[in-house]
Amino acid sequence: INPGSTSTKVSYFENEKNIFTESIFHDAPELLKYPTANDQLPMRRKVLLDFLGKHNIDPGDIDVFIGRGGCAYSQRAGVMVIDERLVEDTARDRGGSDHPAKLGVMLAYDLCKVYGGKMYTVNPTNVDELCDYARPTGIAGLYRRAQTHVLNQKGIAAIHAKKLGKKYEDLNLIVCHVDGGITITAHCKGKMIDSTEGAGGDGPFTPTRLGS
């Protein structure tokens, strides 16, 4: 479950086989009806359930719900179990930003509570691997945050490494995510050590952000 600033991307897997993938785009006038990302939750839930219904998938037959996340406290990269504390921190924007990515955690939690199964988040936007020298700005006391498209960045980097016959952890890469938001990130031996701060409008202008 991958909610973005302009779309909801949903995939259904059986083991490692991708059975269905769909990107449902949301018009700007529709999104402007919702003052905050939290307010979009019922709309995004309907989109998700409509996707499952369209493909004749019973939510009760799903073993694992995985949601994109973000907006909670900083955490390490990888897979994390979704629990009530994470959902609360996510809903309250403990990480200091408000972005629809966080709805992946909330949707996975809601569906799991109704239909059963397990629930995880993978590489949410609040993963922080920045090196110390990437944090200072030109203003005393103001530091850069780690807010980037971690899920796609690390996913594409891993695919690229596999094509090269190498491990992601052995490579140095520059990865650019281009969508409603754009982030450009330096990957060093499996860590995202420097990046533009997408949620704060850092970097190039995008379809939904002014840029710097």
Where do the protein language model's features map onto the residues?
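Short loop/turn microsegments at loop-to-beta-strand junctions
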Residues: 8, 181-182
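A glycine- and small-aliphatic-rich helix-loop capping segment at beta-alpha/alpha-beta transitions
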Residues: 13-18, 78-89, 111, 135-140, ...
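Short glycine-rich, Thr/Ser-proximal phosphate-binding strand/loop in the N-terminal lobe
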Residues: 1-39
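Short, well-ordered amphipathic alpha-helical segments that serve as non-catalytic structural scaffolds
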Residues: 43-55, 156
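Glycine-rich phosphate-binding loop plus the immediately following alpha-helix
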Residues: 102-110, 121, 128, 136, ...
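Short beta-strand-loop/turn "lid" adjacent to the catalytic site in phosphate-handling enzymes
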Residues: 52-100, 118, 126-137
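Short glycine-aspartate micro-motif
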Residues: 1, 62-66, 173-177
